Structure formats: C-alpha cells, structure tokens
Amino acid sequence: MSQNKEAIHFLSRIANLPKGPVSLDAVLQPSLEDEAELRKLFATDKGNARLKDIHVGLVDVFAAPSDIRTTRARVITGDADRDSQHVMPLPDPQRRKEGSPAMVDNLEAFKKNWNIFTENSLSQLSDWSNVVAAGGSVQACLIPLPKAASASKRAMRKHYHERAFPSSDVDLFLYGLTPQEVRHAPFSYPHFSLTPLWKAEHKIITIYEAVRDSVPWDVICVRTKHTVSIHCE
C-alpha cells in the first residue's frame, strides 16, 4: 500500500527527531488526535470521505524508512521516573537499548515468525479478503527475536509458546461483512455452491475449515454473541 497523507506526516516527524534518547510526546500527539477524530467519524459519520481509504490511519512499516523500526529509548531521569509511568515496569535487561531494532526488517521475516507463532494454522486460508489480523499476535511477530530464540524453528516455538507468549491467541477481525449484508464474491462449500453470494457467517466457516485442514489436532469452534473462538491443542 502507498503511504497516506497522515502516515507521511508521522514518518516525517520521526525522521526529524534528534539522535539519542528523546521524548516522543510531540511526535505521537498529532497522530493520537487524528486517531480520536477517525474513531469519532467511524461512530458518527461512516460515509465521510476520509473513511473511503481502507488504509486510513495506518502506516506501511516495511515501506517506511528504518527510523520507524528503530528503538527510541524513553528518557529516564532516575529510578523513580523509570517506574512512575508503568504498573509493572520492565527490568533493565528486558528494555531495548537506544538505536536497537524495534521490529523485524521486512515482511518476509514477519511471515516466518507468524507461521511459527500460529503453527501454520492459517496456511490454508488462501483468501484474506475482508479479514484482518490484529492485536498481540501481530505485535509478537513484529518484535525481533533474541539471538538464542532465532537459532532454529524449534527454538522459536519454545520462545513463543513457552517463554514469551504462552497463553496468547490470534485475533482475526471481519470487515465489510455482516450476517444481514451480502457481498458479491464466489464461495464454495463441500456440499453446495453459493455463487455469487457470500455472508459473514460463510467467511467464518471458511476460516474454521482452513484451521481444521492446517493442523493435525481436533478443532472446536465456539460462537458467542460477538466472537467466534476456534480452539485446538
């Protein structure tokens, strides 16, 4: 995707930061205000022209300069200041150093981490239209791996599933589809064909089947009012 106007402004503010530890408040505040405005538009004016851009409010981090993927350590004036902003502050050994990588370098590295983190459970999902992955699982795969954890796929699995994120799940969100609305797109199901009809529930079934066909374990799908949970070992 191409960077939108808001992303370009944000990247420019990052690029103009001086070297060394520095406060990011002035850089982040305009973006936080813009996000608040977008949230307001989504809630009160969904037909607004700004919302026609499906990437509004987003930054293509891998198409951006390396500044966006570089750690800018928080300015700390003393022990009290280090702990004052956090309920559970990270110990010093876990704090990223100034100038160290804040995320992986490219999309290929992210995909490698993603496949290990998800145990390839979404490898059979060939059509990602109207589906977006977000949340902690994505952030986990963006974070650079410790050297010891990147030695092998086995080491990566132990890092993700036993050390760093032992209870993490994968959050998928549907957009542009509701149970009542019909989207014109081809859909095939084992016992019948729905062409060109496609509803949100059919998309959910497709995701479930993709997970079921990708892992060697039993898969259970549980639907509640607002979510559908897919469980396996």
PLM region descriptions:
Residues 1-233:
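Catalytic cores of the polymerase beta-like nucleotidyltransferase superfamily
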